[in-house]
């Protein structure tokens, strides 16, 4: 089965018995019981109702909740959908909201409670209304309400002062407005956080205090959450990259870990007194990805078991003292062993991906030692693994190389596909680590798709190439094409090698793309019938008007006008071929008949077709999509 280059299948059961259960929420804090909403623009943004991944510039219809609660944010009205923009913030995508279009999204069915912890990563381009809204939480059906008494929680920015503020409404109906304290600059991203605690509602900007108000800890229902709007018409004008909500007030150690995860991911610097993770800095290698951590402020504010969205789980620190943290992230290297030569003697391969650790005090000013820790790797999707072959590789001298190290043995299967090394003492501030194997045959490393590209050729065709690093029980690939990201058809089905541990290249041609924008995606099918879709690629084909065909409309319900330069007096053979290459319609017409009339294809089944028009040994080809009437 295939895993794309920059992701890894994670299948672990989360049980809420804090802190003993795996913490798979943002930064490795919480799980679906407490982390009740989690929207990241790098995960699950669709241009339709959850089927077609959005491409840059496309409108976002659905934004999937990755908390596990299924509270997906949606916008059914096409005119009010924000744009998905790739690579906009530290290489990560954002949703771009336009206030003039009243762009907004709505998440419903959130398991709310009387306490809450909320984060938003955002920036504004302008503040066109008195208080443009980032979030508005309310009871079912009230998330877009302009009635102040129904806005049970929220976060917005004053256009008069550019300061962030918000509110919470208690169950007795008392509205508690957070005082304004911190101004936000135009076009500058921030990590914004509101804590709804037992005795106060407090806001933070990049972890620094940004206003507070007394409260009795009885926040009213916020089962619905408006994103990008408040008060119905006060819309956000700018980018939102991530939204996180907990139905508890997380402790101070957890709050710092979550904020550190967001700051590293989006390339922001926290206030100097709280920058506990340094490995995201360019000079230290940009270990920005899937950051998670453990830490302790005091005995009532600690977090000792974390995993987050990555495959690494660290727990059970033996010497974690007050005001101490261990935070880690990775370099986004491939989860595969091909082409990696930096291994110690006796190790046959290692992950290209490496992790790096910060062990710092709570103010980020000095190194600390949290003691020995347990380090586990979830190898779901790897296939058979013999734990005796696994080696934890630690760059203990911090010289950037693993070849001069000795791998740590002793891995054992905990459950499922989770393999753990207990009481590891080699990890310290700034140290890198990764996972290796002494037998690539018996314990391989994961399957990955290395690349998938689509490029136009000089003769207005499209060449599609993809490369795999390894394959396990792979049956075939299907290349699919669409003119509109809604109607997809097969360009080609290609038999796969099946099982391989070397680089394998594949290539097909699309002989008849549309003039203009074309969308392509790759579908992989296992021998057991399981399928996986890989990200969409786009190609623009210029229309020269001579040797290609255009159809109006396209897609069509069956009545089609052909646009092409043809000899009006010559006889032309018009043929329509389905995806299997079978001719389903043919007739002879003069050029004048062809250009003046309408082809009636209403009796042809819906699907993707190639039309050939031949005359005097010359052939013109075009792609036509027929829809059900």
Model feature map: region roles:
Residues 4, 527-545, 586, 598, ...:
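C-terminal tail/sorting-segment detector
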Residues 23, 213, 220-250:
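Extracellular glycan-interaction patches encoded by glycine-rich segments
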Residues 23-72, 242-311, 381-386:
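GGW-centered surface loops in extracellular recognition modules
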Residues 64-102, 109-112, 118-130, 145-217, ...:
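Extracellular glycan-interaction surfaces
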Residues 276-376:
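Self-processing/autoproteolytic domain segments and adjacent N-terminal interaction modules in large
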Residues 399-446:
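Proteolytic cleavage junctions
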Residues 438-548, 569:
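Short, compositionally biased serine/threonine- and acidic-rich segments at solvent-exposed termini, linkers
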Residues 495-519, 588-619:
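Short, surface-exposed loop/turn motifs with a glycine/proline- and acidic-biased composition
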């Amino acid at each position: 089965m295939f895993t794309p280059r920059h992701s890894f299948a994670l299948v672990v059961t989360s049980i809420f018995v804090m802190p003993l259960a795996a913490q798979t929420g943002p930064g490795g804090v919480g799980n679906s019981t407490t982390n009740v909403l989690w929207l990241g623009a790098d995960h699950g943004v669709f241009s339709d109702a959850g089927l077609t991944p959005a491409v840059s510039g496309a409108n976002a219809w659905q934004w999937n909740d990755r908390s596990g609660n299924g509270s997906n944010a949606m916008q059914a009205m096409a005119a009010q959908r924000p744009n998905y923009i790739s690579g906009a913030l530290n290489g990560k995508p954002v949703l771009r909201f336009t206030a003039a279009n009243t762009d907004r999204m709505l998440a419903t069915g959130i398991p709310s409670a009387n306490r809450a912890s909320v984060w938003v990563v955002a920036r504004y381009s302008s503040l066109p209304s008195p208080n443009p809204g980032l979030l508005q939480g309310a009871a079912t059906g009230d998330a877009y309400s302009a009635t102040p008494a129904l806005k049970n929680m929220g976060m917005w920015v004053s256009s008069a002062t550019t300061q962030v503020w918000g509110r919470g409404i208690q169950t007795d109906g008392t509205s508690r407005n957070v005082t304004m304290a911190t101004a936000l600059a135009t076009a500058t991203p921030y990590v914004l956080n509101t804590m709804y605690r037992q005795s106060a509602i407090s806001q933070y900007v990049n972890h620094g205090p940004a206003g507070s108000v007394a409260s009795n800890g009885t926040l009213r229902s916020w089962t619905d959450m408006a994103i990008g709007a408040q008060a119905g018409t006060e819309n956000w004008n700018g980018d939102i990259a991530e939204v996180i909500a907990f139905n508890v007030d997380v402790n101070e150690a957890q709050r710092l870990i979550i904020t550190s995860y967001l700051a590293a991911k989006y390339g922001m610097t926290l206030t100097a007194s709280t920058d506990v993770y340094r490995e995201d800095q360019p000079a230290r290698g940009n270990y920005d990805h899937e950051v998670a951590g453990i830490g302790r402020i005091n005995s009532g504010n600690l977090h000792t078991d974390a995993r987050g969205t990555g495959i690494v789980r660290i727990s059970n620190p033996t010497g974690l003292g007050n005001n101490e943290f261990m935070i880690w992230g990775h370099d986004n290297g491939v989860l595969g062993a091909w082409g990696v030569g930096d291994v110690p003697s006796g190790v046959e391969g290692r992950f290209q991906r490496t992790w790096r650790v910060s062990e710092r005090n709570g103010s980020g000013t000095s190194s600390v030692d949290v003691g020995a820790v347990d380090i586990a790797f979830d190898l779901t999707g790897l296939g058979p693994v013999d734990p005796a072959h696994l080696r934890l590789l630690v760059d203990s001298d911090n010289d950037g190389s693993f070849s001069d190290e000795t791998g740590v043995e002793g891995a054992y299967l905990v459950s499922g596909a989770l393999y753990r090394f207990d009481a590891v003492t080699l990890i310290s501030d700034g140290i890198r680590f990764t996972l290796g194997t002494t037998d690539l045959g018996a314990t391989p490393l994961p399957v990955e798709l290395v690349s998938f590209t689509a490029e136009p050729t000089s003769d207005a065709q499209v060449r599609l190439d993809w490369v795999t690093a390894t394959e396990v029980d792979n049956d075939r690939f299907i290349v699919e094409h669409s003119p509109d990201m809604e109607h997809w058809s097969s360009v080609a089905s290609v038999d796969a090698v099946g099982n391989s541990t070397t680089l394998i290249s594949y290539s097909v041609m699309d002989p008849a793309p549309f003039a203009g924008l074309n969308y392509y995606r790759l579908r992989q099918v296992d021998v057991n019938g399981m399928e996986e879709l890989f990200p969409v690629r786009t190609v623009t084909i210029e229309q020269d008007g001579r040797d290609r065909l255009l159809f109006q409309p396209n897609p069509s319900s069956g009545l089609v006008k052909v646009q092409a330069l043809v000899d009006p007096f010559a006889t032309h053979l018009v043929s329509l071929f389905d995806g299997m290459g079978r001719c389903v319609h043919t007739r002879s017409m003069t050029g004048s008949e062809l250009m003046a009339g309408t082809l009636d294809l209403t009796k042809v089944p819906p699907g993707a077709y190639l039309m050939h028009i031949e005359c005097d040994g010359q052939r013109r080809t075009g792609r036509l999509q027929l829809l059900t009437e």
